[in-house]
Amino acid sequence: MTIGAFVAFPALADPAKGLEIAEQRKAVDMGWGDSVATMEMLLRNKQGESSSRLMRLKSLEVDDDGDKGLTIFDEPRDVKGTAFLNHSHITKSDDQWLYLPALKRVKRISSRNKSGPFMGSEFAYEDLSSFELGKYTFNYIEDAKIEGVDTFVLEQVPTDKNSGYTMQKVWLDQQFYRPVQVEFYDRKGALLKTLSFEDYKQYLNQYWRAHTMSMQNHQTGKSTVLTTTDLAFQTGLKDKDFQKNTLKRAK
C-alpha cells in the first residue's frame, strides 16, 4: 500500500477468524511471568544522522489485566535516570507515568497524549502497551507470504477513541503466531509507520521475542530501531517493583 493510500476494508474480511487467530496469538504467549531486557534505542533522522540510547526494560505479566512495564534509561547522560512506567489494561486506557530527573518530578501521560512520541522516538506511548484482545476489534484478511514466511494478515482496529490510529495491519507467522510486520494508519487513514520484527529467539522452550524491532515513519522519514542485547526471564520481579512512588528511585 502506497504512502497516503486510504484504508479499504475488503468485502471478504472475516471478523470471527480474525478474533480466533488473535486469541491464539495471546494464548501461546501466556505464563512467562517476568523479564528484564537490556536494549539499545537507535534514533535516525531524515538526513540519516543517528543517536543512540541505552535502556533497560522490566516487564511483569499480570493475570486478568494488561502487563506492567518499567523502562529505565542509562545512557547518554542527558537522559540517564529517566524512567517510564506503564500499567497496561485490557479495555480501559493504560496508566502511564514518566519521571524526568532534570525536573525531579513524575509526569502522568494523559489518555489524549498516548499518540505522542516516546522520548523523541518513532514509537508512540500507545505502542508500548502489552497486546490485549480487548484493545481491538479484529478482521482476518488473507494468507500471505512475507519474505518467504507464511503469514495470516489481520486488520485490528483500536477500541480506544484516543488512539492515534484508525487501523493496524498485522502479519503473523502461521507457525508460531509471532508478529512479522505491522502497518499503522493515522487518523486520516493514511499509512503512517511500519514496524518490522527480526532476529527472534525462543526462551523457556516456548516464548519468542524479537531482538530487533524497526519502526519506520513514512511521513517524516525518521526511524527508530530497538535492539535487545540481553534478556532474562523469571527474575523474581514483583508488583511492588512497578509502582509510581518508586519511579524516582528506579534502578
Regions flagged by a language model, labelled:
Residues 14-102, 139:
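N-terminal mature ectodomain segment of secretory-pathway/periplasmic proteins
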Residues 142-145:
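A short, surface-exposed loop/turn module that caps and links secondary-structure elements
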Residues 74, 85-87, 95-99, 105-109, ...:
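Gly/Pro-enriched, hydrophobic low-complexity segments
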Residues 8-10:
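N-terminal signal peptide c-region/cleavage motif recognized by signal peptidases
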Residues 19-20, 51-52, 128-140, 189-194:
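A short, amphipathic edge element
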Residues 250-251:
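Short, solvent-exposed mixed-charge patches
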Residues 32-36, 66-68, 133-135, 149-151, ...:
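Sequence-level motif detector for i,i+2 pairs with an aromatic at +2
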Residues 1-5:
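Sec-dependent N-terminal signal peptides
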